[in-house]
Amino acid sequence: MSKEIKAQVVVLGSGPAGYSAAFRCADLGLDTVLIEKYNTLGGVCLNVGCIPSKALLHVAKVIEEAKAMAEHGVIFGEPQTDINKIRLWKDKVITQLTGGLGGMAKMRKVNVVNGYGKFTGPNSIVVEGVDGQTTVTFDNAIIAAGSRPIKLPFIPHEDPRIWDSTDALELKEVPEKLLIMGGGIIGLEMGTVYHALGSDVDVVEMFDQVIPAADKDIIKVFTKRISKKFNLMLETKVTAVEAKEDGIYVSMEGKKAPAEPTRYDAVLVAIGRVPNGQLIDAEKAGINVDERGFIHVDKQMRTNVAHIHAIGDVVGQPMLAHKGVHEGHVAAEVISGKKHYFDPKVIPSIAYTEPEVAWVGKTEKEAKAEGINYEVSTFPWAASGRAIASDCADGMTKMIFDKDTHRVIGGAIVGTNGGELLGEIGLAIAMGCDAEDIALTIHAHPTLHESIGLAAEVFEGSITDLPNAKAVKRNK
């Protein structure tokens, strides 16, 4: 059965970027259609990404904390895991959140069309759904088509023992020996989960550190911890993958490469994601898509076709849900007639591992590359009463200041719940705060949060919780 719908705005894709754009359009009084290929809203993030991974990481954290407490006199015994119940818990979290989105769409009178949408012209999209074909004609469009995992031609991806992130999140089994290709955030988060559930985990990364975007001093602290969980093979890459009846055999080359192919029960390919710009027939609407699948936009999220905007993963790095949400708001507001722009000072990044790795603003290597006259100040959690009492004293808080203006331009945290502490640094950068503003703000004690204020005190030379390198020298 074929039907037609007319809308002021159509949003293609209902991930965080897409549903935020659609809901904002509706709130601004625009008749809005939201197209989604899944049966539920939320896209990759809610269904097979950010949210289910955090549910599983919560389980992993509880398991690891229970084991660690034995050293402090609280013995629970060896944790017994029921994979089916863990999976049900993860699915319950997804259902609760996607159901909530569905309810908000109805409340806002957003017309949700389920199926795969492709452009047929500059003002039309055809959606192929289980109930037939729907043609949506529109005045304005917002593309939020997202991204998908990268696949390599020499890997037999059709073998069920070769996983991408979606497969890993299904939690069908816990392999005895797991290889993770890629030392980025997704791979390390999944490695954290499967290690806690009992897998022997190897991680292969072609660069000289995991999470290559983060600064080396932060990753040095992180690596010291995770090396106890994973076998890290840095400066090493996979050259061949062969599926055999008794396992997946992987050949490698580089600094840590085994001499012979290594057998694994499963291999998680987590080497990044590719945008879906080439999968929506954008060219039929006159939209320019580059050879990688990205759609380029201006600061109002407009494509080269003025009434069509694009947001989220499909417009470029970083591929982060929170970036897409803000882009979605801008696109909706521009369509409604507001003169808004996407020009963020900060976009935070977080690896929800244990310990967490989080950074915002400029990294030290970025500041150096840009020729900024900067100074780094750090506060080691080994000097934090709360960190010591909470058994996480191996963390660190790092702040980067402009030496000329004393303004904070970046910051990073490695440690338990580091991502939850990052907000103050992001706000300080966005508001143009200097070191004195942060140092003179009274932070509660004892908290991990106060490490941010103490790092600012290090820069200011007013620190009393550490030896003060900037103290006035006195004659004996």
Where are these regions (language model features)?
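Glycine-rich flavin
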Residues: 2-7, 17, 23-174, 207-211, ...
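Flexible, glycine-rich terminal cap/loop adjacent to redox cofactors
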Residues: 10-21, 26-38, 44, 51, ...
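Short hydrophobic core segments
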Residues: 10-12, 117, 136-146, 181, ...
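Glycine-rich Rossmann-fold phosphate-binding loop(s) that bind the pyrophosphate
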Residues: 13-16, 181-184, 313
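Glycine-rich dinucleotide-binding loop and its adjacent helix/turn
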Residues: 50, 145-200, 204, 232, ...
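Short, acidic, Ser/Thr-enriched surface-loop or helix-capping motifs
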Residues: 114, 290, 298-299, 364, ...
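FAD-site-proximal beta/loop scaffold in flavoenzymes
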Residues: 158-175, 261-335
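Active-site substrate-recognition segment that forms the wall
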Residues: 186-207, 231, 302-309, 315, ...
